[in-house]
Every structure is written in structure tokens, then in C-alpha cells.
Amino acid sequence: MEHTILILILPFLSFLILGLAGMRMKNGLAGAIGTVSLAGVTLLSYLTAFNYFAGGRTAEGVYPTLTPYNFEWLPFTTNLHIDMGIMLDPISVMMLVVISTVSLMVHIYSFGYMKGEKGFQRYYAFLSLFTMSMLGLVVATNIFQMYVFWELVGVSSYLLIGFYYTKKEAIAASKKAFIVTRFADLGFLIGILIYGYYAETFSFTPQLQVLAVAGSMIPLALGLMFIGGAGKSAMFPLHIWLPDAMEGPTPVSALIHAATMVVAGVYLVARMFPLFIGYAPEVLHWIAYIGAFTAFYAASVACAQSDIKRVLAFSTISQIGFMIVALGVCTSMNPHEGGLGYMASMFHLFTHAMFKALLFLGAGCIIHAVHSNEMSAMGGLHKYMPVTHWTFLIACLAISGIWPFSGFFSKDEILTACFQFSPVIGWIMTGIAAMTAFYMFRLYYCIFWNGEWKGHSHESGLGAHTPHEAPLTMTFPLMFLAAITCVAGFIPFGNLISSNGEAYTIHLDMQIAATSIIIAIASIALATWMYAGKKQPVANYLAHTFPRLHTAAYHRFYMDEIWLFVTKKIIFRCISTPIAWWDRHVIDQFFNFTAWSTHATADEIRDMQSGNVQQYSIWFLAGALILTLILLV
């Protein structure tokens, strides 16, 4: 496994080369350097996965945890130090495959999508940095190393979301993403420091006897760490940055939503899962409730959005909620006794990465063809874009949980885990799954059917044009991801990844599976009835019948306005303003008085320096007399 270090080195070298010398290169060469390096990373990731899982299990029946590279970076005490290295276990190996695959498809796709864009070389440099950061995060040997790459992921996302730096919206979106996640990451950092202090290590597997002494501080540390994960994974109410992140290039959205930034929080909880189960089960259950509410909220908002990318953004938030719920409903490390959700969450992370990347890249082809994000400017595109149409349909069926596509298998395992934990949670998540099928096929019909194409004129004034299929560099990733989406559900995932590391054979709960399929088909039928027609009479009727609800959902239930009120009216006015007054009128005046008194004293002392030697002698004798009296007394 010595070659695993190249998985990090190759994209880093690509970033350095393109960042330092990219502007001297032609676009094709810059793109080729980034893409070839990612192709190498992908091949190495596949080789690592094959060697790891083909190597077999240990005598205890679990896959081993390998550390091909590890060195001490910063020592603090005998036990407490920060290491840097590479750790391979089932979930880190799986994430290597997911990240490298999606990133490679994004690199290939960007050849066509970003053609002619200013800053092409800079774009590929940032893509390489983004990919390297996430790869480093998932192979981290300890929580502090994870935090280092965690922050690199945040910086990379800031650079890519704000790629179009001449657009005010892109600048605002990148700042918003950076600031919101920084607030969350503060909780993550405090949690890491508390954990390191009481556990006497930054390792993912501390000594049990040390944790027993730490008591309630470990649950506190884990809860604070989850705040960081909630910010990265856009959990309510820290989700507000993700929809605005759509201002970046569409391929970047695919990478952020499918394989990098937003799944980092899920990976964090999965990585710390043994500690959550052993020392903070109540925190884990609260995580489930937060995930369930987030999934419902995001699904509700997605039903009313008109921007194709924002529908997919809220879809991502909802699906991340599913993964978080699956982890939160676990009550045991044994998959047969309450630990099924761990495997289900990782399974859904894998399948979701493929079909969500497919959806975003398909959306990019559509935007590339019609030059608009608004669904009202689309319709009837199935005639003009057959490859995009069929691959997009496959992704919609997968995310809706229709057999035999991959989303059916992973979502069914999540629902089974939820019903094992609580029938109430199970039915809530089933209802959210139905909403998912509805808003995804609302999106599908508004884009590809819904009458004839409305037409669009180029900004250059060339007049209306007919939409066209994207070039092969853009459609090949669609076909590749669609193929994976069709077959990924049949991977024996439980044999590779489970909560306790032992092989687990997935058994479909036929009652739950049948119920979820029936409800999904009913939701698709409802979307067909409402949106497949040319004039959408039912949809328009409902929007006018419930205008306040529709408007509230369209405006994301005014969460942006609420956050603006909290920050501007409460934090800035009620907290920052008094603090600023105290700083100016108390702190500043204190130091001003100190400076004035020092200056006044100096003036008085200066007057004593008259140049008269006799006067100096008198002062000297007086001082000596005073010192003598003090010593005698």
C-alpha cells in the first residue's frame, strides 16, 4: 500500500504546476494536466480498494486498519501529539473511490463546460486543490489531521464558489459559505481541543480507561464536533450557504454536493461512530432528530423552487439528512442489533454521490444548451437532448427509490433502520422519500416535457436558437455515472462495510420495500398529473390556492431573513454595539488616562531637572535620608 501516498501527491503537484505556471499554458494543456493527474489518482484508488478488500479479513472476521504512512508532526506531551499520515479502513477506502471517481468525471466534463472561460487554468488548479483536500481528510490518521484538511476543503470551496469573481452574487456566495462554515468550525475546533485534553490523544481510538475518567466531557466534545459537521453538511439551521453556492460553475456544484464538502460532516460522524455509540448515544439520537427535520425542511423548499440548480441543492440537503438520520438511529455496533444505520448511511453516501453528480452534470448540459437556470425557460428538451434526457431520468428514478436503481437499495436500508429505531421516525422518513420523488419528477417534467421548448436568445443578439446535445466530453461522464447508478445497488455493500466491521448480508424488508416503492410511484404519478401537461393547470391552481405556503417555501421559509435579523439586529446591535461602546468609552479611556498620567508625571519630573548642581545634591541627600529611615524602621 506504499503507493497510497501518490493519491495525495498527484493532485497537489497538479495544483502547484497549474497555480504557478498555468497562465503560461494553453487551456487544453492545463486541463490535460489536471485530468491526467486525477486519472492517475483514480486508478491508484481503485488499486488500493482492490488490494485492501481482496486482502481478506483478519482472524477476528474484520478488515484490518492499515497505516502505511505515519509520522509525529507536533509533540505536546508524552501521550499527546499530532501525527500526519495515511490510514486505510473500509470507509476511508470507499471514500477514496467515491471522491476520485466523481472528481475525474468533473475534470473531463469541465473540458466542454468551461471551454472559452476566462481563468480556465485557475479553475483546474482549484479543482486539484479541492480534490487533494478531501482525499487528505478521509485518510487522516487522527482528528487534528482531519481538521487541517477540513479547513483546506473550506478554503478550496471558497475559491471555487467565487470563481466568477467579477459577479457580485458569486463574491457574496463565497463569503457566505466561508463565514457560515467558519462559525461551525469554531465548535469543531473547541470540541477537538476538549477531546484531546481529556482523552490525552487526538487518535480516533483512544484508550478506554482514559475516556472512563473523562466522564461527561467526551459527549460535550463530540457534540461540538458535530456542530462543525453540521456546518459542512448544511444541516438546519446552518444550511443557508449551500443554495447560494450555486453561483459557482455547475461542475463545481457537482463536486461539492456529490463527493466532497457536504459529505464531510457525514464522514466525521461515521469516523467517530464508536465513540458516539459508547459515550454519547443521546447526542447521536439528537443528531437523528436534526437530520430528520433538515430532510423534511429541505424537501419542502425543493417543491417550490424554480431554479434547476437550487432544486438540486435542497435535494442534497435532504439526502444528507437521510444519511445523518441513519447514523443517528443506531443503538449498537452490531448491525443485527441496532447498527444497521451505519452501513445504510455509508451505502447511501456511495450511491448518492453517483446519481447526484449525474444530476448536476446533467443540469450543466441543460444550462449550457438553453443559457438559463430557470425551469420556466425550458420544456420539451427530450427531443433535442436525448443522452441528457435518459441519463437525467435514470438519476431521478434512483433518487426516488425506484427498483432496480441504486437509490432504492440504499434508501430502503435507511428506512429499515429507522423503523427498527422508531416507527414514527420510519414513517416520517418514508413521507420525505415520497416528497423526494415528487419534486424530482416535477423538475424532470418541467425540463424535458411540459409542452414545447420556450426558446431563448443569445446575449450576443444572434437570436433564438435550437437547443443541442452537449459535446462528448460532457455526455461521457453522464453515461459513465448513469451506468454506475444502474448497477451500484447490487454491490454486496454489507460484506464490505458495517458498523462493527464484520460481514453483514443485506436482506430487504419486503414490506418496507413494497411500501416505499408504492409511495414513490404514487408521488411520481402526482407529479405527472400536475406538471406533465402543457399548461400545468393543477400546479398553478395549488400555487394560487395556497399562496402564502407556496411563497414561504419559495423563499426558503425566510431563513436567510431570520439569520440576517439575528446577526444584524441581535448580534451586531444588541451585542456588538454595547461591546463597541465599552471598548471606546471604558477600555480606550482607561488607556488614554494611563498615557495622560504618564505624560503629566514626566512633565513634573522634567521640571526637577533644573541644571543646578546644588539642587541635585539636596534631592540626593533627601532621598538617601528617606531610604535610611525606611531601613531603620
What is the role of each PLM region?
Residues 77-81, 87, 494-511, 532-633:
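Aromatic-capped, Gly/Pro-kinked transmembrane alpha-helices
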Residues 105-146, 155-465, 490:
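Hydrophobic transmembrane alpha-helices and their helix-loop junctions in integral membrane proteins
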Residues 27-41, 173-185, 382-391, 468-482, ...:
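Alpha-helical transmembrane segments and their helix-start/interface "positive-inside/aromatic belt" motifs
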Residues 8-23, 104, 230, 234, ...:
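N-terminal signal-anchor/start-transfer transmembrane helix
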Residues 1-9, 25-32, 80-98, 136-149, ...:
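Membrane-entry segments of alpha-helical transmembrane domains in multi-pass membrane proteins
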Residues 2-3, 21-125, 197-215, 219, ...:
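Transmembrane helix-loop-helix hairpins at membrane boundaries of multipass inner-membrane proteins
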Residues 397-409, 413, 481-500, 567, ...:
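Alpha-helical transmembrane segments and their membrane-interface junctions
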Residues 467-525:
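Hard-cation-handling environments
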